[in-house]
Amino acid sequence: MRRKRYERFRRAVIGVTLSALASGGLLAATTTPSTAATTPPSAPATSHPSASAWTVSDPARSALTARLALDAAGELRLAVARGGEPVLSPGRLGIRTDQHDLTTGLRLIGRKDRTVHDTYRMTTGKELRRSATMRETTFTFRGADGARLGVVVRVSDDGVAYRYVLDERGPVTVTGEASTFEVPADAKAWVQPYATSYESERTETTAGAANAAEPRTCADDTCSFGYPTLFEVDGSYVLLTEADVDGRYSGSHLDHKDGATAYSVALADDEPVTSPGPLSTPWRTAIVGSLDTLVGSTLVDDLAPPSRVRDTSWIRPGTDDWSWLSDTNSPGDFDRQRDFVDYAAAHGLEYTLVDAGWKASWVPELVRYARARGVDVILWFDWADLKTQAQRDAWFSKIKAWGVVGVKVDYMYSDAQSTFQWYDAILRDTAEQHLMIDFHGATIPRGLQRTWPQVMSVEGVRGKENGQNPTRDVFLAFTRNIVGSMDYTPTWFSRPNRQNSLAHELALPVVYESGWTSLGDNPEGFAAQPVAERYLEQLPAAWDETRFVSGGPGQQSTGERQAVLARRSGDRWFVGGILAGTGGTMKAPLGFLGKGTWLVETVADQDGQLRRTVRTVTAKDTLAVPAAANGGFAALACPAAKGRTDCDQPVTTAPATTLATDPSTVTAEAGKKASFGATFTLPEGAALRDVRMTVDRGRLPAGWSAAGADVRARSLPAGKELKGRWTVTVAGDQPGGTVEVPVVVTYAHPAGGSTPPVHVEEVVRVSTPLHGTVYASDQPFLGESNGFGPVERDQSNGEAGGQDGKPLTIGGTVYAKGLGMNAPGQVRIDLQGRCTRFEAHVGVDDETDGKGSVTFTVLGDDDRQLAATDVLHGGDPAQPLTADVTGVHTLTLTAGDGGDGKNYDHADWGLARLTCAD
């Protein structure tokens, strides 16, 4: 079969070549130029008028070759062979713009060869230190109308890629590509019906019959499939994807006609893309080789532009606990989020991720609580709240002031050029603000983690939130996770009706790579699995080396599917094995371990529980682990030493400390001074190192200043107090209200190394007397709740995030100041007992188009009602609402839902203001 396929491949290439030669009267030319000869990068382009087929080989000339051929019609085709055997048959190349058709009528006018050698370092991924060598040939063609087309072909030991170069100086509009990959119809295929979420289920089929996988995604006889798409051709694996996509282009996918061998590149939404010229398109990429080659491939990153972030010291991969998966309502519960912070602190996790539902009113307090315990906070955002530059500027500066270190951004669901332009913008902004980022509801990674190393992970996968499927788990190890970090959210041990075993679940964060690994269970679920807890405490988030061990996406001879991968961090190897099927013995040859004797801890299923065993092995041994149905195992190997009984490294956590301010609240008029002190203590434990206490002057409002020296201690033993004192000067034009002045203590984390210092913070609330006219939207909230998203200041209620509303509008009147709620909503404001009157124009915002019903209530101290409206409906004119607030300290403004639920209940408090003492 293989020999027949090779003959078909050879005849196809020769046929294209001879046709072109005959048309040019050049049949006597028998030598095919090869890029194997070294040509300096600076060598001028040379014309090869006699050539119509050219070979580019991998630098070692050992396995892969790409063969580019030009036929009699001037059409280009590219074929790929491995070890002389065909892998991809000749597939069309070419590109169309609104000015030129560069898919036919082409002739070669130049060629340039070079070897690309690149070394770089990643912050995440399967291998931190990278080295890539690729053979590159740039072919220059001229079209029938005189336009020039560059085709750049690169071949490495793990794949082949090509891109188009258009050297036009003005804007270039690409209307489509002729690019196709030709795969034998009977080749095994693992495909994913295309969806912009990349959350479709993968299916095993054949290349020709792939359209039967999910006919609902098809139009007529053509179906679309998302990257990466995997094929097996006579023992060689081919993973098709793309690399180096940014806002100059759109993402693409593969279109396939039923029964055909061609998989054609289609631009997102079948829309043209326009870019400033000259234009280099994304790389059309095929990772080619054995499963070992695929698992270890870094080709997608190798093809991406170098890092645009010079200083990466602030970027830290790690593990986070995450409450949303096990309880979707929990991110809105401050106390529950503290539980997750406590768990992270106790088990050495770097982060807590707070998902959809968090409240701006309590996030700063949660961040202070977490940082004092050595845990950093990641916040979820709906991308609708970060779409514009103004939104990003406002939110990023705010959360940086809170102490948030990263964001998880959700719901992009698009491969359009405009979306990639948004990716460019938010990546630039997060790099400038030193915010790490995880893209959820996103496209797949196409090398962006090399260019933007603050990208910790990307979803682009049907993950845990979409149910369980052990077969899917195996497929993903050989498809999606090959091309970049994958936010799969593993380890939900307590999941009801779990379909895989405990050991399968534990193995997933080793089988899958992610710069941020979001653990899916809750503290109680983890506590019920102490063996798993111990293993997860040791788990790194970035790797020095990754190896394929055994298994594959296809069924084994015994009927099950397996994936076993090994990843190294320092001198320790972590091994994860997962199985889809009835169970059996999983085998892991240990040749990757190297010389000497090794200690191996193995965690596997036994009688429905996790059991840990320890043994000594060498690289000649094979680990054999009995596996349950849909089971697996997790192992940890380290060099054996006398007296060593495990591979654990210490889990070092931040100690409990106290930071108290005295007083915690002070009053100062505009332009006046206020003084306060602070005391920091370590009650017990080993002495702290490099301790510093200061006022964070960078977070003071404009016009404020702070006097007083920082207080430092090289060593602070338990029981000894560190004291400081400062005086702040209030800005002369400071309006009434309360400003939080942060007092910060930092000290070296006991773990040492590159672990960031522990940050302990308390705030002194400096209260400036309210005077004159005071707008409610300018005051800090003592508390806040809302029916949907946050309460908005000076705009109507928007989406799930903040600052995404529209101008407050009731009955056609626009109000520049006020509050926007979605009933039921409420805010509490400190009046200091200095105000006498509250007034506002209230009603349902016009954006509801006549829908919605709301009540408005004003409450004083002890929730005493001061004023209220009847039920107001959408389309009603604004109603004046006034209340006597003389002597009131806490004012509460409440919007009720009118008794019929909260839909469309956008409650506006137009020009909500107070009259206070002068």
Where are each of the predicted segments found?
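Carbohydrate-binding surface patches
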Residues: 557-595, 633-636
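Secretory targeting and sorting signals
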Residues: 2-39
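Gly-Asp-aromatic-enriched flexible segments
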Residues: 760-918
